[in-house]
């Protein structure tokens, strides 16, 4: 017996279930393409929704910030790592998000797992959408308070729960949802949720990770102009960079600076990352044409896939779940598409529910209509070999 026997046992269990995850080296190529093992593939599974990750301005400003402020922030922002470039980015972000204040955090996962525990005490109640991201689920667990799930995108069920819990003695109630759901590509009913939060004196926190850059006024998300207490989002998707943010009131920002363990005990983001974020925030507001192209191509692909009998759920965004059911079918389809020149990764449990394995297609503004049609044809060829 070895003290590490449990490691091999777990890996073997995953191999037997075809759920062993492995890493593949990827190199960016031109446009929306990547190179894997010498093969050029059109990438249809990245979150680089506006194609900004290799934009010259992001690269240039990352270099400029690194030259001015160095390679690293050297410490937590509460010690000596709060370089002046943070203020520059946060002030710009708050203006764009139409909130009094904003705070840069290190990653989307860190944000959700530190904001939720900060907002709640042991006597709180979190009302969470049933299909929320794993980072929200873990944030709820770390909050160590009561958690109730409401049916996915169902304001009526949420209202029922709010009524039922009104006089249960909770110190506060917090509703948490994604605005654009990462695995299903559908959007929450923001007006309904905001109305319920106001009517029932509940806090509302919205994860805008997959909406930032793509939806809303100037691409700043579906919460813009809405009465949402805590808006979390990321820079590693539509903005093409890395990191996360929370947009909120000035008082909440001060509260998070003092209460968010993930912020307090982490070294600040490197200046180069802040530079690329700063550049993205200059570019994104003026990219309405790219946003329209992206969403038009997604709508076109949904129609094309439907003609082949594929189920894309309730998707209404740049994310299209092509749901095929079994894990083996998703793996087979992924390999088939790679043979046709597309990188399209299979998404399987536990990332999605059992029997809902899928190819998660996520389009970019760099994809042309011809790219989308070729992808649709490849799906059709798998359906009708």
Curated annotation (Swiss-Prot):
What protein does this entry describe? Putative 8-amino-7-oxononanoate synthase
Record's keyword annotation contains Transferase: yes
Instruction: Please tell me where substrate binds in this chain.
Output: 21, 133, 351
Query: In which domain of life is the source organism classified?
Result: Bacteria
> Record keywords: Transferase included?
yes
Q: How does it assemble?
A: Homodimer.
Q: Which family does it belong to?
A: Belongs to the class-II pyridoxal-phosphate-dependent aminotransferase family. BioF subfamily.
Q: Where does pyridoxal 5'-phosphate bind?
A: 108-109, 182, 207-210, 234-237
């Amino acid at each position: 017996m070895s003290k590490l026997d449990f490691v091999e046992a777990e890996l073997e269990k995953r191999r037997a279930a075809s759920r062993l995850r492995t890493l593949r080296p990827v190199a960016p190529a031109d446009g929306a393409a990547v190179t894997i093992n010498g093969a050029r593939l059109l990438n249809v599974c990245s979150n680089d929704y506006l194609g900004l990750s290799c934009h010259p301005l992001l690269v240039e400003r990352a270099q400029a910030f690194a030259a001015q402020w160095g390679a690293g922030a050297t410490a937590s922002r509460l010690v000596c790592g709060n370089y002046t470039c943070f203020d520059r980015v946060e002030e710009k972000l708050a203006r764009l998000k139409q909130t009094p204040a904003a705070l840069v955090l290190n990653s989307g996962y860190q944000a959700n797992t530190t904001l939720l525990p900060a907002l709640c005490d042991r006597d709180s109640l979190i009302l969470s959408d049933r299909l929320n991201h794993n980072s929200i689920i873990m944030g709820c667990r770390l909050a160590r308070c009561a958690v109730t799930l409401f049916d996915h995108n169902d304001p009526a069920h949420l209202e029922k729960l709010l009524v039922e819990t009104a006089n249960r003695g909770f110190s506060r109630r917090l509703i948490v949802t994604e605005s654009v759901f990462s695995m299903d590509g559908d959007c929450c009913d923001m007006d309904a949720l905001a109305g319920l939060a106001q009517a029932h004196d509940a806090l509302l926190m919205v994860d805008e990770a997959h909406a930032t850059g793509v939806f809303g006024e100037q691409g700043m998300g579906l919460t813009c102009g809405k009465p949402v207490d805590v808006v979390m989002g990321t820079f590693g998707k539509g903005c093409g960079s890395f990191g996360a943010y929370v947009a909120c009131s000035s008082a909440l920002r001060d509260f998070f600076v003092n209460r968010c363990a993930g912020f307090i005990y982490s070294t600040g983001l490197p200046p180069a990352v802040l530079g690329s974020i700063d550049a993205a925030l200059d570019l994104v507001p003026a990219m309405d044409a790219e946003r329209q192209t992206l969403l038009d191509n997604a709508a076109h692909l949904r129609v094309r896939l439907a003609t082949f009998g594929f189920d894309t759920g309730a998707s209404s965004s740049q994310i299209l779940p092509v749901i095929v059911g079994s894990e083996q079918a998703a793996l087979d389809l992924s390999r088939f598409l790679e043979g046709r020149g597309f990188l399209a990764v299979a998404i399987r449990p536990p990332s999605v529910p059992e029997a809902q394995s899928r190819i998660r297609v996520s389009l970019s503004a760099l994809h042309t209509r011809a790219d989308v049609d070729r992808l649709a044809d490849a799906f059709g060829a798998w359906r009708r070999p």
